[in-house]
Amino acid sequence: MLKLPGEMCNINCHYCYERRKPYPNALMLKPEVLREFLTLCGGRPLAVELHGGEPLLIGRRKMGDLFAELRSYEGPVTVSMQTNGILLNEAWLDFFDREWPDIEIGISLDGDEQGNAHRVDFRDRPTYRKVTKALDMMAARGRNVGVIVVVTRRILGRAADVLDSLSKFEAVKVVKLSGCLDFNVRSKDYQTPNRKSLQILNPDGVGMPGWATTPDEYADFLIEAFEHWSATRSYGAYVLEPFFSVIRSLSGLPTSYTSFSDRKEPFVVTLYPDGRIGSSDELSMPGALLGSVDTATGMDELLTLDSNPGLRRDLSALLAKCAGCSHEASCRGGALPDRLRFEGTGFEEEYCDYRRKVIDHVAAALPAAA
Protein backbone atom coordinates (compact mmCIF):
# COMPACT_ATOMS: atom_id res chain seq x y z
CA MET A 1 0.00 0.00 0.00
CA LEU A 2 1.41 3.37 -1.04
CA LYS A 3 0.44 6.38 1.08
CA LEU A 4 0.90 8.92 -1.71
CA PRO A 5 0.16 12.11 0.29
CA GLY A 6 0.44 10.62 3.77
CA GLU A 7 -2.48 11.78 5.90
CA MET A 8 -3.29 14.82 3.75
CA CYS A 9 -6.87 14.89 2.55
CA ASN A 10 -9.37 17.32 1.08
CA ILE A 11 -12.05 16.20 3.54
CA ASN A 12 -12.05 15.48 7.27
CA CYS A 13 -14.04 12.32 8.01
CA HIS A 14 -14.76 12.00 11.70
CA TYR A 15 -13.64 8.35 11.90
CA CYS A 16 -10.49 8.56 9.73
CA TYR A 17 -7.82 6.28 11.20
CA GLU A 18 -5.04 7.73 9.05
CA ARG A 19 -5.36 11.14 10.67
CA ARG A 20 -4.88 9.53 14.09
CA LYS A 21 -1.35 8.42 13.19
CA PRO A 22 1.85 10.34 13.91
CA TYR A 23 3.13 12.12 10.80
CA PRO A 24 6.33 14.02 11.61
CA ASN A 25 6.50 15.61 8.16
CA ALA A 26 3.89 16.59 5.57
CA LEU A 27 5.33 14.94 2.47
CA MET A 28 4.31 13.46 -0.85
CA LEU A 29 5.73 10.08 -1.85
CA LYS A 30 8.73 10.65 -4.11
CA PRO A 31 9.87 8.38 -6.97
CA GLU A 32 13.25 7.73 -5.37
CA VAL A 33 11.60 6.48 -2.15
CA LEU A 34 9.33 4.18 -4.15
CA ARG A 35 12.34 2.97 -6.16
CA GLU A 36 14.17 1.96 -2.98
CA PHE A 37 11.07 0.16 -1.74
CA LEU A 38 10.63 -1.72 -5.02
CA THR A 39 14.25 -2.85 -4.82
CA LEU A 40 13.37 -4.51 -1.49
CA CYS A 41 10.49 -6.34 -3.20
CA GLY A 42 12.94 -8.31 -5.35
CA GLY A 43 10.71 -8.94 -8.36
CA ARG A 44 7.93 -10.74 -6.47
CA PRO A 45 4.36 -10.13 -7.74
CA LEU A 46 2.85 -6.97 -6.28
CA ALA A 47 -0.75 -5.83 -5.81
CA VAL A 48 -0.27 -2.10 -5.27
CA GLU A 49 -2.99 0.08 -3.76
CA LEU A 50 -2.73 3.87 -4.03
CA HIS A 51 -4.02 5.30 -0.78
CA GLY A 52 -3.93 8.27 1.53
CA GLY A 53 -5.27 10.57 2.84
CA GLU A 54 -6.55 11.36 -0.59
CA PRO A 55 -4.20 9.93 -3.25
CA LEU A 56 -5.33 12.33 -6.00
CA LEU A 57 -3.88 15.26 -4.03
CA ILE A 58 -0.46 14.23 -5.30
CA GLY A 59 -1.37 15.52 -8.76
CA ARG A 60 -1.03 13.95 -12.18
CA ARG A 61 2.60 14.85 -12.83
CA LYS A 62 3.87 13.33 -9.59
CA MET A 63 1.62 10.30 -9.91
CA GLY A 64 2.92 9.82 -13.45
CA ASP A 65 6.47 9.72 -12.07
CA LEU A 66 5.40 7.01 -9.61
CA PHE A 67 3.72 5.01 -12.38
CA ALA A 68 6.98 5.16 -14.33
CA GLU A 69 8.74 3.53 -11.37
CA LEU A 70 6.07 0.83 -11.16
CA ARG A 71 6.34 0.12 -14.89
CA SER A 72 10.09 -0.35 -14.56
CA TYR A 73 9.68 -2.91 -11.74
CA GLU A 74 11.02 -6.32 -12.73
CA GLY A 75 8.01 -8.29 -11.50
CA PRO A 76 4.27 -8.28 -12.29
CA VAL A 77 2.27 -5.37 -10.84
CA THR A 78 -1.46 -4.71 -10.53
CA VAL A 79 -2.66 -1.29 -9.36
CA SER A 80 -5.80 -0.17 -7.55
CA MET A 81 -6.72 3.10 -5.89
CA GLN A 82 -9.03 4.07 -3.03
CA THR A 83 -10.31 7.66 -3.30
CA ASN A 84 -13.12 9.78 -1.89
CA GLY A 85 -13.90 10.63 -5.52
CA ILE A 86 -14.29 14.38 -5.07
CA LEU A 87 -11.26 15.32 -7.18
CA LEU A 88 -11.95 12.67 -9.81
CA ASN A 89 -12.70 14.33 -13.15
CA GLU A 90 -12.38 13.74 -16.90
CA ALA A 91 -8.74 14.83 -16.87
CA TRP A 92 -7.91 12.23 -14.22
CA LEU A 93 -9.71 9.48 -16.11
CA ASP A 94 -7.88 10.46 -19.31
CA PHE A 95 -4.66 10.26 -17.31
CA PHE A 96 -5.45 6.75 -16.04
CA ASP A 97 -6.50 5.60 -19.52
CA ARG A 98 -3.10 6.68 -20.73
CA GLU A 99 -0.82 5.77 -17.81
CA TRP A 100 -2.43 2.65 -16.26
CA PRO A 101 -5.55 1.61 -18.20
CA ASP A 102 -6.50 -1.38 -16.05
CA ILE A 103 -6.30 0.43 -12.70
CA GLU A 104 -9.15 -0.59 -10.38
CA ILE A 105 -10.80 2.41 -8.72
CA GLY A 106 -12.57 2.21 -5.38
CA ILE A 107 -14.65 5.05 -3.97
CA SER A 108 -15.56 5.62 -0.32
CA LEU A 109 -19.24 6.45 0.24
CA ASP A 110 -21.28 5.44 3.27
CA GLY A 111 -24.49 4.63 1.43
CA ASP A 112 -27.07 7.41 1.14
CA GLU A 113 -26.78 11.08 2.10
CA GLN A 114 -27.89 10.45 5.67
CA GLY A 115 -25.43 7.62 6.13
CA ASN A 116 -22.57 9.63 4.66
CA ALA A 117 -22.86 12.31 7.36
CA HIS A 118 -19.50 11.43 8.98
CA ARG A 119 -17.71 12.05 5.66
CA VAL A 120 -17.52 15.84 5.78
CA ASP A 121 -15.17 18.65 4.78
CA PHE A 122 -13.18 20.72 7.26
CA ARG A 123 -16.25 22.83 8.05
CA ASP A 124 -18.52 19.81 8.58
CA ARG A 125 -20.24 20.37 5.24
CA PRO A 126 -21.58 17.26 3.47
CA THR A 127 -19.64 15.66 0.62
CA TYR A 128 -22.25 13.20 -0.67
CA ARG A 129 -23.32 15.00 -3.85
CA LYS A 130 -19.74 15.67 -4.89
CA VAL A 131 -19.00 11.95 -4.70
CA THR A 132 -22.10 10.84 -6.57
CA LYS A 133 -21.08 13.08 -9.47
CA ALA A 134 -17.92 10.97 -9.73
CA LEU A 135 -19.99 7.77 -9.81
CA ASP A 136 -22.11 9.14 -12.66
CA MET A 137 -18.98 10.18 -14.55
CA MET A 138 -17.45 6.73 -14.13
CA ALA A 139 -20.56 5.14 -15.61
CA ALA A 140 -20.48 7.55 -18.56
CA ARG A 141 -16.88 6.48 -19.20
CA GLY A 142 -17.77 2.79 -19.04
CA ARG A 143 -15.77 2.21 -15.86
CA ASN A 144 -16.82 0.03 -12.95
CA VAL A 145 -16.09 0.88 -9.33
CA GLY A 146 -16.16 -0.75 -5.95
CA VAL A 147 -17.62 1.23 -3.05
CA ILE A 148 -16.49 0.92 0.56
CA VAL A 149 -19.27 1.63 3.05
CA VAL A 150 -18.14 2.20 6.63
CA VAL A 151 -20.88 0.86 8.88
CA THR A 152 -21.32 3.62 11.46
CA ARG A 153 -24.22 4.26 13.80
CA ARG A 154 -25.70 6.46 11.06
CA ILE A 155 -26.78 3.48 8.99
CA LEU A 156 -27.74 0.90 11.62
CA GLY A 157 -31.19 -0.51 10.86
CA ARG A 158 -31.17 0.98 7.35
CA ALA A 159 -29.36 -1.65 5.29
CA ALA A 160 -32.04 -1.69 2.59
CA ASP A 161 -31.86 2.10 2.16
CA VAL A 162 -28.07 1.97 1.93
CA LEU A 163 -27.96 -0.80 -0.66
CA ASP A 164 -30.82 0.61 -2.73
CA SER A 165 -29.13 4.01 -2.85
CA LEU A 166 -25.92 2.48 -4.18
CA SER A 167 -27.61 0.13 -6.63
CA LYS A 168 -28.94 3.16 -8.53
CA PHE A 169 -25.43 3.92 -9.77
CA GLU A 170 -24.61 1.96 -12.90
CA ALA A 171 -20.86 2.01 -12.23
CA VAL A 172 -21.11 0.29 -8.81
CA LYS A 173 -20.32 -3.41 -9.18
CA VAL A 174 -18.88 -4.19 -5.73
CA VAL A 175 -20.06 -2.97 -2.32
CA LYS A 176 -17.95 -3.69 0.74
CA LEU A 177 -19.58 -3.20 4.14
CA SER A 178 -16.64 -2.39 6.39
CA GLY A 179 -16.99 -2.48 10.17
CA CYS A 180 -16.34 0.60 12.27
CA LEU A 181 -15.38 -1.14 15.49
CA ASP A 182 -13.30 1.64 17.02
CA PHE A 183 -12.54 1.47 20.73
CA ASN A 184 -10.09 3.55 22.78
CA VAL A 185 -8.95 5.51 19.72
CA ARG A 186 -7.69 9.04 20.22
CA SER A 187 -8.43 11.72 17.63
CA LYS A 188 -5.67 14.26 17.09
CA ASP A 189 -6.66 17.81 18.02
CA TYR A 190 -6.30 19.49 14.65
CA GLN A 191 -7.05 23.21 14.61
CA THR A 192 -9.79 22.88 12.01
CA PRO A 193 -13.24 24.51 11.96
CA ASN A 194 -14.91 21.19 12.72
CA ARG A 195 -12.67 20.23 15.64
CA LYS A 196 -15.62 20.74 18.01
CA SER A 197 -17.55 17.95 16.28
CA LEU A 198 -14.66 15.56 16.83
CA GLN A 199 -14.40 16.61 20.48
CA ILE A 200 -18.11 15.86 20.95
CA LEU A 201 -17.93 12.50 19.16
CA ASN A 202 -14.66 11.41 20.75
CA PRO A 203 -13.87 13.67 23.73
CA ASP A 204 -11.13 11.71 25.47
CA GLY A 205 -10.30 8.68 23.32
CA VAL A 206 -11.74 6.33 25.95
CA GLY A 207 -14.33 3.71 25.09
CA MET A 208 -16.47 3.79 21.97
CA PRO A 209 -16.56 7.02 19.93
CA GLY A 210 -19.86 8.37 18.66
CA TRP A 211 -19.50 6.93 15.16
CA ALA A 212 -18.60 3.35 16.14
CA THR A 213 -20.78 0.27 16.56
CA THR A 214 -20.47 -2.79 18.73
CA PRO A 215 -19.60 -6.09 17.04
CA ASP A 216 -23.14 -7.36 17.64
CA GLU A 217 -24.68 -4.25 16.05
CA TYR A 218 -22.41 -4.71 13.05
CA ALA A 219 -23.48 -8.36 12.77
CA ASP A 220 -27.16 -7.41 12.80
CA PHE A 221 -26.57 -4.84 10.06
CA LEU A 222 -24.71 -7.39 7.93
CA ILE A 223 -27.49 -9.95 8.27
CA GLU A 224 -30.08 -7.30 7.38
CA ALA A 225 -28.01 -6.38 4.31
CA PHE A 226 -27.61 -10.02 3.28
CA GLU A 227 -31.35 -10.61 3.51
CA HIS A 228 -32.11 -7.57 1.35
CA TRP A 229 -29.41 -8.44 -1.19
CA SER A 230 -30.81 -11.97 -1.46
CA ALA A 231 -34.50 -11.00 -1.51
CA THR A 232 -33.96 -8.46 -4.29
CA ARG A 233 -31.68 -10.88 -6.18
CA SER A 234 -29.13 -8.10 -6.39
CA TYR A 235 -26.26 -10.59 -6.55
CA GLY A 236 -26.61 -10.34 -10.32
CA ALA A 237 -26.04 -6.58 -10.18
CA TYR A 238 -23.21 -6.21 -7.65
CA VAL A 239 -21.01 -8.29 -5.39
CA LEU A 240 -21.60 -7.65 -1.69
CA GLU A 241 -18.74 -8.11 0.75
CA PRO A 242 -18.11 -9.68 3.16
CA PHE A 243 -20.64 -12.23 1.89
CA PHE A 244 -18.81 -13.18 -1.29
CA SER A 245 -15.79 -13.98 0.89
CA VAL A 246 -17.89 -15.76 3.52
CA ILE A 247 -19.36 -18.04 0.85
CA ARG A 248 -15.92 -18.78 -0.59
CA SER A 249 -14.58 -19.45 2.89
CA LEU A 250 -17.44 -21.83 3.70
CA SER A 251 -16.63 -23.61 0.45
CA GLY A 252 -12.98 -23.96 1.44
CA LEU A 253 -11.85 -21.52 -1.24
CA PRO A 254 -9.30 -18.72 -0.82
CA THR A 255 -10.32 -15.06 -0.68
CA SER A 256 -8.40 -11.81 -0.94
CA TYR A 257 -10.52 -10.15 1.78
CA THR A 258 -8.08 -10.14 4.72
CA SER A 259 -10.82 -10.61 7.30
CA PHE A 260 -11.70 -14.02 5.79
CA SER A 261 -8.31 -14.95 4.40
CA ASP A 262 -5.49 -17.10 5.71
CA ARG A 263 -3.20 -14.27 4.63
CA LYS A 264 -3.40 -11.76 7.43
CA GLU A 265 -1.96 -8.30 8.08
CA PRO A 266 1.72 -9.28 7.68
CA PHE A 267 1.01 -9.82 3.97
CA VAL A 268 0.09 -6.12 3.69
CA VAL A 269 3.03 -3.73 3.73
CA THR A 270 2.55 0.05 3.80
CA LEU A 271 5.01 2.60 2.45
CA TYR A 272 4.77 6.10 3.92
CA PRO A 273 6.09 9.23 2.14
CA ASP A 274 9.07 9.66 4.48
CA GLY A 275 10.30 6.13 3.74
CA ARG A 276 8.86 4.45 6.82
CA ILE A 277 7.50 0.97 6.22
CA GLY A 278 4.65 -0.39 8.30
CA SER A 279 2.47 -3.47 8.35
CA SER A 280 -1.22 -3.11 7.42
CA ASP A 281 -2.27 0.54 7.46
CA GLU A 282 -5.20 -0.40 9.71
CA LEU A 283 -2.73 -1.15 12.50
CA SER A 284 -1.76 1.86 14.59
CA MET A 285 1.59 3.53 14.23
CA PRO A 286 4.26 3.46 15.52
CA GLY A 287 3.19 0.06 16.88
CA ALA A 288 3.11 -1.41 13.37
CA LEU A 289 6.41 0.10 12.25
CA LEU A 290 8.68 -2.42 10.50
CA GLY A 291 11.54 -0.17 9.44
CA SER A 292 12.30 2.10 6.52
CA VAL A 293 13.64 1.94 2.99
CA ASP A 294 17.04 2.83 4.49
CA THR A 295 17.12 0.10 7.13
CA ALA A 296 15.17 -2.87 5.72
CA THR A 297 17.20 -5.63 4.08
CA GLY A 298 14.45 -7.31 2.07
CA MET A 299 10.77 -8.16 1.83
CA ASP A 300 11.14 -11.47 3.69
CA GLU A 301 12.22 -9.57 6.79
CA LEU A 302 9.16 -7.30 6.52
CA LEU A 303 6.61 -10.05 5.87
CA THR A 304 7.83 -12.18 8.77
CA LEU A 305 7.75 -9.14 11.11
CA ASP A 306 11.32 -9.95 12.19
CA SER A 307 11.96 -6.25 12.80
CA ASN A 308 8.95 -5.94 15.11
CA PRO A 309 8.82 -9.04 17.32
CA GLY A 310 6.27 -7.42 19.63
CA LEU A 311 3.76 -7.05 16.81
CA ARG A 312 4.45 -10.60 15.63
CA ARG A 313 3.88 -11.90 19.16
CA ASP A 314 0.61 -9.98 19.55
CA LEU A 315 -0.82 -11.08 16.21
CA SER A 316 0.27 -14.69 16.71
CA ALA A 317 -1.35 -14.73 20.14
CA LEU A 318 -4.65 -13.63 18.63
CA LEU A 319 -4.58 -16.39 16.03
CA ALA A 320 -3.57 -18.95 18.65
CA LYS A 321 -6.83 -18.23 20.49
CA CYS A 322 -8.70 -19.51 17.43
CA ALA A 323 -7.40 -23.05 17.88
CA GLY A 324 -10.25 -25.44 18.53
CA CYS A 325 -12.99 -22.95 17.65
CA SER A 326 -15.89 -24.55 15.77
CA HIS A 327 -15.65 -21.80 13.12
CA GLU A 328 -11.88 -21.64 12.77
CA ALA A 329 -11.83 -22.95 9.19
CA SER A 330 -14.47 -20.52 7.90
CA CYS A 331 -13.71 -17.47 10.06
CA ARG A 332 -9.93 -17.63 9.58
CA GLY A 333 -9.19 -15.31 12.47
CA GLY A 334 -11.10 -12.18 11.51
CA ALA A 335 -9.65 -8.68 11.27
CA LEU A 336 -6.63 -8.60 13.56
CA PRO A 337 -6.54 -4.78 13.94
CA ASP A 338 -10.09 -4.88 15.33
CA ARG A 339 -9.21 -7.73 17.66
CA LEU A 340 -6.13 -5.91 18.92
CA ARG A 341 -8.22 -2.85 19.79
CA PHE A 342 -10.65 -5.03 21.73
CA GLU A 343 -7.98 -6.80 23.79
CA GLY A 344 -8.75 -6.28 27.48
CA THR A 345 -11.99 -4.35 26.83
CA GLY A 346 -14.56 -7.08 27.40
CA PHE A 347 -15.54 -7.10 23.72
CA GLU A 348 -13.23 -9.96 22.72
CA GLU A 349 -15.91 -12.65 22.92
CA GLU A 350 -18.56 -10.43 21.35
CA TYR A 351 -16.25 -9.98 18.37
CA CYS A 352 -16.01 -13.74 17.92
CA ASP A 353 -19.77 -14.08 18.44
CA TYR A 354 -20.41 -11.59 15.63
CA ARG A 355 -18.28 -13.68 13.30
CA ARG A 356 -20.06 -16.91 14.18
CA LYS A 357 -23.46 -15.23 13.89
CA VAL A 358 -22.82 -13.93 10.36
CA ILE A 359 -21.17 -17.13 9.13
CA ASP A 360 -23.99 -19.30 10.49
CA HIS A 361 -26.62 -17.08 8.88
CA VAL A 362 -24.98 -17.29 5.47
CA ALA A 363 -24.36 -21.03 5.82
CA ALA A 364 -28.04 -21.63 6.62
CA ALA A 365 -29.11 -19.60 3.58
CA LEU A 366 -26.90 -21.39 1.07
CA PRO A 367 -28.95 -24.62 0.71
CA ALA A 368 -32.11 -22.56 0.12
CA ALA A 369 -30.35 -20.45 -2.49
CA ALA A 370 -29.06 -23.56 -4.23
What are the functions of these language-model segments?
Residues 1-103:
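Conserved alpha-helical substructure of the radical SAM core
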Residues 32, 119-132, 136, 140-265, ...:
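Radical SAM enzyme [4Fe-4S]-AdoMet core and its adjacent flexible, acidic
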Residues 62, 77, 97, 103-106, ...:
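Internal, well-ordered domain-core segments that constitute the primary functional module
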Residues 2, 93, 97, 101-113, ...:
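Non-cysteine beta-strand/loop elements that form the S-adenosyl-L-methionine
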Residues 276, 282-370:
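Flexible mid-to-C-terminal extensions adjoining Fe-S/redox cofactors in radical SAM and related proteins
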Residues 4-6, 54, 83-87, 109-111, ...:
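Short, flexible loop/turn elements at secondary-structure junctions
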Residues 1, 45-49, 78-80, 104-106, ...:
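Structural preference for beta-strand elements that scaffold enzyme active sites
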Residues 19-24, 118-125, 340-342:
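Short glycine-enriched, charge-decorated loop/helix-capping segments at active-site entrances
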